[in-house]
A protein has these predicted regions:
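NAD(P)H-binding glycine-rich loop region in Rossmannoid oxidoreductase-like domains
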Residues: 51-90
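C-terminal substrate-binding subdomain of Rossmann-fold SDR/epimerase-dehydratase oxidoreductases
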Residues: 200-203, 207-314
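Conserved Rossmann-fold NAD(P)-dependent oxidoreductase catalytic core, especially the SDR/UDP-sugar
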Residues: 96-138
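N-terminal Rossmann NAD(P)H-binding glycine-rich loop of SDR-like oxidoreductase domains
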Residues: 3-23
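Glycine/proline-rich active-site loop of Rossmann-fold NAD(P)-dependent oxidoreductases
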Residues: 144, 157, 169-185, 212-213, ...
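Conserved beta-loop-beta element that borders a ligand/cofactor-binding pocket
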Residues: 114-115, 148-173
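Flexible, glycine-rich beta-alpha linker
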Residues: 119-120, 134-138, 162-181
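A conserved pocket-lining segment of Rossmann-fold NAD(P)-dependent short-chain dehydrogenase/reductase
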Residues: 166-176, 186-210
């Protein structure tokens, strides 16, 4: 099996590529991104690719005889509000290019991460797969398009498109990349380096989150799931939900001198438009999804690994 990963140098891609290479063989997983310097760190095989460059995308699929695409290239929520036009170009036209290139190039399967940002203020807590989608951000709108276009290509052309609606993803290996849930990573960096963090959301802001190992598990587990068991193309998944204050308290147990304050900015409105909890029972039933990490265990692992990475003792 030959795999192409777009957006391979992002928060998820930089950890997914090594995992897939271990699974399928280094030579069978092609990393692609627009950032050459970061691609070199992932090592070959890699290709410099802007997903808006359809000609290059077609050529890569043909040259490497790609069977599966993990389409991770995207502009995230907060950055998407700073430049909604670019967000539309990359996230909507990019996913269309990937779907069309896959259809014409004989690709068997596409995995597209979606997001809790597809929901909006009208969404009730604990939404299911069929809950109303009325996002208030360009990022969320673009991901609704990705989901619906994926469904369309599956129903019309038989292209096996699958995806998980990821919550905020937390990782110590890669810095956050412009999302509304970045505070859940930044707080750990600040706790170790400065002993203090100013959140850009209110203390009672509660959002669904997931530790990176679980995010990688969800993506790869759904990719390999028995198609006859799948009721949906895109599934809710979640690891945990916690408030900013709860995160502070958990960090304080491990770094007692840590302090925090809360100064909500424009990202607070985005956070308020998303549900605080997610129902992922369909994923549990259809492909045996189950997260491995809770808040306390994740916090301990984050602090242990980040302090080593930053060369700091806590």
């Amino acid at each position: 099996m030959r795999v192409l990963v777009t957006g391979a140098c992002g928060q998820i891609g930089s950890e997914l590529v090594p995992l897939l290479r271990k699974k399928y063989g280094k030579e069978n997983v092609v990393a692609s991104d627009i950032v050459v310097e970061k691609l070199e760190k992932l090592s070959e095989p890699y290709e410099v690719l802007n997903v808006l460059d359809r000609e290059k995308l077609d050529a890569i699929i043909k040259e490497y005889e790609i069977d599966v695409i993990y389409h991770l290239a995207a502009i995230l929520s907060a950055k998407g509000e700073e430049n909604p036009q670019l967000c539309f170009q990359v996230n909507v036209n990019g996913v269309y290019n990937v779907l069309e290139a896959a259809r014409l190039g004989g690709v068997e399967k596409i995995i597209i991460p979606s997001t809790i940002a597809v929901f909006g203020p009208e969404t009730p807590d604990y939404p299911k797969e069929v809950t109303i989608l009325k996002p208030r951000t360009m990022y969320g709108i673009s991901k609704v398009f990705a989901e619906l276009a994926g469904e369309y290509y599956y129903n019309k052309y038989g292209l096996d498109v699958r995806g998980v609606r990821l919550p905020g993803v937390i990782s110590w290996k890669t810095p956050p990349g412009g999302g509304t849930t970045d505070y859940a990573v930044e707080a750990f960096y600040a706790a170790i380096e400065k002993g203090h963090y100013t959140y850009f959301v209110s203390e009672d802001t509660t959002l669904p989150m997931m530790y990176m190992p679980d995010a990688l598990k969800a993506l790869t587990q759904l990719a390999e799931a028995d198609p006859t068991r799948l009721r949906f193309r895109f599934y809710n998944v979640v690891g945990m939900s916690f408030s900013a204050k709860e995160l502070t308290e958990v960090i304080k147990k491990l770094i007692p001198h840590f302090t925090a304050d809360y100064k909500p900015d424009e990202r607070q409105k985005i956070a308020e438009s998303w549900p605080s909890h997610i129902d992922d029972s369909a994923a549990r039933e259809d492909w045996d999804w189950k997260p491995d990490w809770d808040l306390e265990r994740m916090a301990k692992d984050m602090i242990e690994n980040l302090s080593k990475k930053l060369g700091k003792s806590v």
